[in-house]
Swiss-Prot record:
Belongs to the LacAB/RpiB family. The keyword 4Fe-4S does not apply. It holds the Pfam family LacAB_rpiB. Gene3D superfamilies: Sugar-phosphate isomerase, RpiB/LacA/LacB. Pathway: Carbohydrate metabolism; D-galactose 6-phosphate degradation; D-tagatose 6-phosphate from D-galactose 6-phosphate: step 1/1. Heteromultimeric protein consisting of LacA and LacB. Its EC number is 5.3.1.26. This is Galactose-6-phosphate isomerase subunit LacA. InterPro entries: LacA (IPR004783), RpiB_LacA_LacB (IPR003500), RpiB_LacA_LacB_sf (IPR036569). It comes from Staphylococcus epidermidis (strain ATCC 35984 / DSM 28319 / BCRC 17069 / CCUG 31568 / BM 3577 / RP62A). GO terms for biological process: D-allose catabolic process; galactose catabolic process; lactose catabolic process via tagatose-6-phosphate; pentose-phosphate shunt, non-oxidative branch.
Length: 142
């Protein structure tokens, strides 16, 4: 599994913090916006496209409030994403919705919470079963 991470200018500091945290915990991390000053649209598209290259990839996109990146991610065919600002939602969106990507707002989520959100998201596993009905419904919408 590779964690694809990216941010716009407003999310850069938090992105670096999360990236360092994940790498310190032996996750394979690919920063698709390293050294770039991108708008949230471009940064989110970069994350989503890289996530879709492998079924094992997960993505984290960070902007000021998380909403912009969420809107962009959900416009991409086949992408299930969630805007999260708490650990439980991050875990549950993986387990029940099979989300491949989360978005966070650097102006909303503090440092410790951001690390915990990332940890719960990447440690979550899709439960399948009855939840697959919803995932199929989402995929039919694209």
């Amino acid at each position: 599994m590779t964690i694809i991470i990216g941010s716009d200018v407003d999310g850069k500091r938090l992105k670096e913090l999360i990236k360092d945290y994940l790498e310190d915990n032996d996750y394979d991390v690919l920063d698709v916006t390293e050294g770039k000053d991108l708008d949230f649209v471009d940064s989110t598209v970069s994350v989503a496209k890289e996530v879709q290259k492998s079924d094992d990839n997960l993505g984290i996109a960070i902007d000021a409030y998380g909403a912009g990146s969420f809107i962009v991610a959900t416009k991409i065919k086949g992408m299930i994403a969630a805007e999260v600002s708490d650990e439980r939602s991050a875990y549950m969106t993986r387990s029940h919705n099979n989300a491949r990507m989360i978005t966070m707002g650097a102006e909303i989520v503090g440092d410790t919470l951001a690390k915990n959100v990332a940890k719960e998201f990447v440690n979550g596993h899709y439960d399948g079963g009855r939840h697959q009905i919803r995932v199929d419904m989402l995929n039919k919408m694209c």
